[in-house]
């Protein structure tokens, strides 16, 4: 895969430039654009993934299905599709917006900061998974209610962005409705 960049943003969310993805994620990460997606299978189960140990931020942590960064000139929806193919080897239905104004800042145990405007999407898988081990070290298909209960009971076991997304009542309601609509 070619070198990825992040789109830097000002405080109002207006693009101000780009920076190479790995150079962008430091202890002083600038605000940038990202996306987060929750994928469901035909049974309505959520794909929960465990980040590869080689990941710069939050290695080995359980998280929602796939996250990434749109490239310059690429829509968020196209970025979701691209990363699903790259990380999971899977085709998906058109991504649907779940939490369009999600924004967060979090610091992982090594000091790496995520500082993102990060719209959240949901989609369904339409093919079998072909996991990229450089991105994902493990995965599970789970009932959404069980995952949400797990997040509520043990938030430390999941990525901070997944916990924050699940804490939003409107996003939680939309994810539940999406999971039930087969």
Curated annotation (Swiss-Prot):
Q: Which reaction does it catalyse?
A: isopentenyl diphosphate = dimethylallyl diphosphate
Could you tell me which pathway this protein works in? Isoprenoid biosynthesis; dimethylallyl diphosphate biosynthesis; dimethylallyl diphosphate from isopentenyl diphosphate: step 1/1
Q: Where does Mg(2+) bind?
A: 87
Single GO MF descriptor: isopentenyl-diphosphate delta-isomerase activity
A single GO cellular-component term on record? cytoplasm
Residues bound to Mn(2+): 25, 32, 69, 114, 116
The catalytic site is made up of 67, 116
User: Which GO BP terms apply?
Assistant: dimethylallyl diphosphate biosynthetic process; isoprenoid biosynthetic process
- Kindly list the cofactors needed: Mg(2+); Mn(2+)
Q: What are the protein's UniProt keywords?
A: Cytoplasm, Isomerase, Isoprene biosynthesis, Magnesium, Manganese, Metal-binding
* Nudix hydrolase domain boundaries: 30-164
Cofactor annotation comment: Binds 1 Mg(2+) ion per subunit. The magnesium ion binds only when substrate is bound.
One Pfam family this sequence matches: NUDIX
Main localisation, per the record? cytoplasm
Location(s), subcellular: Cytoplasm
EC numbers listed for it are: 5.3.3.2
Reported function: Catalyzes the 1,3-allylic rearrangement of the homoallylic substrate isopentenyl (IPP) to its highly electrophilic allylic isomer, dimethylallyl diphosphate (DMAPP).
Q: Which family does it belong to?
A: Belongs to the IPP isomerase type 1 family.
Subunit info here reads: Homodimer.
Q: Could you identify this protein by its name?
A: Isopentenyl-diphosphate Delta-isomerase
């Amino acid at each position: 895969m070619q070198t990825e960049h992040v789109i830097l943003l000002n405080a109002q969310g207006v693009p101000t430039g780009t920076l190479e993805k790995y150079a962008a994620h430091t202890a002083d990460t600038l605000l940038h654009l990202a996306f987060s997606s929750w994928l469901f299978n035909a049974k309505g189960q959520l794909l929960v993934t465990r980040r590869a140990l080689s990941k710069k931020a939050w290695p080995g942590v359980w998280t929602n299905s796939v996250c990434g960064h749109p490239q310059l000139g690429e829509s968020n929806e196209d970025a979701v599709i691209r990363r699903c193919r790259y990380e999971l080897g899977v085709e998906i239905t058109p991504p649907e917006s779940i939490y369009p104004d999600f924004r967060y800042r979090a610091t992982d145990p090594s000091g790496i900061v995520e500082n993102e405007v990060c719209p959240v999407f949901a989609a369904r898988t339409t093919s079998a998974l072909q996991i990229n081990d450089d991105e994902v070290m493990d995965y599970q298909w789970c009932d959404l209610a069980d995952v949400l209960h797990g997040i509520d009971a043990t938030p430390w076991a999941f990525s901070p962005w997944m916990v924050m997304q699940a804490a939003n009542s409107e996003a939680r309601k939309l994810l539940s409705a999406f999971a039930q609509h087969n």
